[in-house]
Amino acid sequence: MFLFALVYTAGTVSGMYGRGFGFLGFAMLVVTLIAECVVSKGSLSGIGRIVVLLILISSAVFATAQFRYASVDENRDSYMQYMTDEKSVIVWGKIYKTEYKYFSYRYYMTDCVVQPGYGKAFGRKISCGDVVVYCDSKSAHLGDYMKACGKIGLFKSATNEGEFDRARFYRSQGIDFSVNADSIKTSAGKHAWYYHGLEKLRDTLSASLLEVTDETTAGVLSSMLLGDKSYLDDEIKDLYQVSGISHILAISGLHISIVGMAFYKLLRKRRVSYTAAFVCSAALILSYAVMTGNAVSTRRAVGMFILTMLAAALGRCTDMLNSLGIMVIYLLWDNPMVLGYAGFVFSVGAILAIGIVTPVMSAPKGGKFWTSVSIQLPMLPVVAMNYYELPLFAVFVNLIVIPALPVVFISGLLASAAGCFGVMPGKLLVFPAFAALKLYEMLCGLVMKLPGASVITGAPDGYRIFLFYAVMSGFLVAFSLKKRAIECGLKEKGQILYSVQRVVCTAVLLAILFVKPKTAAQLDILDVGQGDGIFYRFESGTCIFIDGGSSDRKQLGENVIMPFLKYNGIQSISYWFVSHADSDHISGLSEVIDSGYTIEHIVVAEAAAKEEAMEELLFKAKEAEIDICLMSKGDSIEINDASGSHSTANEEADGIMCLYPGPSDTALDRNDMCLVLKLTDGRFSGIFGGDISSEVEKKLVNEYGDELSVDFYKANHHGSRYSSSADWIEALSPRWAAVSCAAENRYGHPADEAMDRLMDAKCRILYTMQSGQIKYKESAIYENNRQ
């Protein structure tokens, strides 16, 4: 079954990333039919017939997976074309999960039917995927049937590398869209007493935890035990993530095993039959799954537990990998899109590591260290793909964290139950969990202070992931043979050699992820809404950033800039240039400084350094021990190596030259004191002028003339009509230009007049509001990661 699960997954992947791969299934089927003809003539032995049969079944499984994905995808496309943002709809469905988050109630509905329009104009009713309804009040319960009237909210796709892709995330959950409800009506569903009881039990236990311990501890325990992340502290969540222990916050096989096995063994001690004990235990953990939100990892764990208990009840046995295979096929059949969900990949990947790698790589005499390594090493590419950084000390942290988890779980569970009857018993029972969680927090805090605790790797390329697992497979084969020899009585020398080989394996695999080839020069204009954010990496590897702010996108540094830098494997910025101190140019930079990310120098115009807003930014930078550089007209920073160097002599050298303002320049408008930069790197050159107006442009044209000629022009002031004058554009004569602004803004950017002047100059114009992030690399321009 495990083999067929691999084939089914491959079929789903081929459907997801290109129907063109369908020829593989067809080819497998043709080969199988030919082989079957040979078999029918008696040319093959019994083993040959089995091989042909396996190929035949695998071909059918592969084709079935492709067909299932295609049918689900096409069905979704058939009705999603009618769903647009802010469209009025009525939606009916059954609530399978409730959640309170960001000051609103969320109701997740399945078995949904949607009717576009309500009031006087109705469309036809359409069956659709799951829907999440946002409501200001708690007026519905788990298991209820709901009718919601409101407006559709489509989930936005990521427009920058590394940015959280809401559309992809919710699609992987089987959720099509959200509805901001104006009104809702509910009716009790079938077995409402059961669902209402589970919801009330969860809410009661969650409230009990808040009574018996502090909010931070209660938030972690509620997430671990009840799947309720309403009170989970964001700082704790981030700390666990960068330390490599965020997995403890999810309902997993450990929780299911503790609850289910404890109840099963209790019933068996009471001399309940195997069958009855199995049925009761299965009912308990299924109810637990429903109560905690029925997440993908929970369903996987529950399914594997039920298969194990069923085998025991029938007097048979099952193995981990085949149980996993059955659940993978079930989950992918139910929702093929789940393959794009990180939680699914982590859940399945961890079991694969335990079932395949751990038995081979763990020490013959049972070393816990190598057991921990064998679980986490295969997961490193998955972690890097999702978080773009790796916690190097996670192996050691988990050696302490995981053994204490049962204590935390049992203590928290008993405390939440006891707290319903009295605060004092709950406080006593929660103390072990409280102490363990504080130990976790302290341990993670100490580890994060160590150099290299979290290394930014960037999103690994496909070939590096393939190489990683290919090399690992080769090592595992070698380890398997070596371990078998040791278990057969090989001497101590063989055991030492085996340990050395494991160290070499770990080092080689880490090198595949960490060591990256030299990359080409790269320019990125990020989609920051109404603002600016520009990244450039020189051929030498030196990385700079220009501005980084937005007036309409909140938490820009956390949600856009930092994920972009991590995605691209940028471990530090050598020079961060600030054109001026308007919030739409520095809001994200301020957050990046607060995050502790490495910035070596912040460069500002000397003439504007005394402005109040700029002084506040520079004060924050000094507190973060970032070097402050003041730049004036004629100054340049040469980039001759990976470190860069300051100079005022060679204007032709690769680097950044300041064109404006000089020490004596003044202006009534802050925009006209922007740092104007000319970047030169080999054959590429560009002009970045912040928000300067046509008056400053005129000064620069008069002073520099043809020296302003460049390949690329970052349109001044987001494409304002008062910038990008005809003389300025003629002097620059750029091949292409980028305009950074929001699709909807109160300034009228970009102005038709300015764009007309650029088009008259035969300049190709790209807009972040249309193209998302714009990338220039190896003489090619990419919009939304497409050339």
Model region roles, listed by residue range:
Residues 539-544, 549-609, 703-720, 733-738:
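Active-site metal-binding motif and surrounding structural segment of the metallo-beta-lactamase
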Residues 1-78, 300, 484-491:
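N-terminal leader/targeting segments
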Residues 601, 697-772:
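Cap/insert and terminal regions of metallo-dependent hydrolase folds
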Residues 5-9, 294-488, 692, 700, ...:
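Internal transmembrane alpha-helical bundles of multi-pass membrane proteins
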